[in-house]
């Protein structure tokens, strides 16, 4: 068994990158590691928007050598990433549910700038949504959204995602 564990350990300790600074994670507050990975997903898959449930991001990214083990601590769940064309009105519902909701970890996203009052009731929180290209979110337009299977299956109450058949 020892050769098997050595092989597994060597894979987990494989260096993937070098990070110059710590990227912190607060599941209910600011998540620099969440922001970073949402930007990676959005840009890497040429999506308009990246969304991820905050509860799926579990750790901080250390400075220095970044290993497979580090990434597995951050993303410990066996998630699959999908893209879907999502109607603007559905995306707005997802954002309303994901910001300021005390029952779930804060929604992580990239490609959007949101003006909202999280003290208001769900459905009344968001006053404006601007995409990274400067355009305003249009309810009738479809956007390429990248997210994980948990969100696209309606997990954490993200029922507007569930309609997209992932």
Q: Where are the predicted features?
A:
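Acidic/histidine-rich, surface-exposed loop or edge segments in extracytoplasmic proteins
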Residues: 12-24, 73, 158-164
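Phosphate-interacting basic helix/loop segments used at nucleotide- and nucleic-acid interfaces
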Residues: 25-26, 35
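Feature captures C-terminal
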Residues: 31, 35-166
């Amino acid at each position: 068994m020892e050769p098997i564990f050595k092989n597994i350990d060597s894979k987990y300790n494989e260096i993937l990158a070098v990070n110059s600074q710590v990227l912190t994670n607060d599941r209910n507050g600011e998540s620099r590691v969440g922001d970073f990975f949402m930007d990676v997903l959005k840009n890497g898959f040429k999506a308009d928007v990246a969304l991820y449930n905050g509860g799926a991001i579990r750790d901080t990214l250390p400075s220095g050598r970044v290993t497979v083990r580090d990434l597995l601590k951050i993303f410990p769940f066996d998630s699959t990433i999908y893209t879907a064309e999502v109607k603007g009105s559905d995306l707005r519902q997802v954002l309303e549910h994901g910001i300021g909701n005390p029952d779930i970890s804060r929604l992580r996203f990239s490609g959007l700038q949101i003006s909202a009052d999280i003290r208001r009731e769900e459905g009344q929180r968001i006053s404006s949504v601007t995409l990274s290209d400067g355009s305003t979110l249009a309810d009738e337009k479809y956007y390429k959204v990248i997210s994980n299977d948990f969100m696209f299956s309606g997990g954490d109450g993200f029922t507007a995602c569930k309609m997209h058949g992932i």
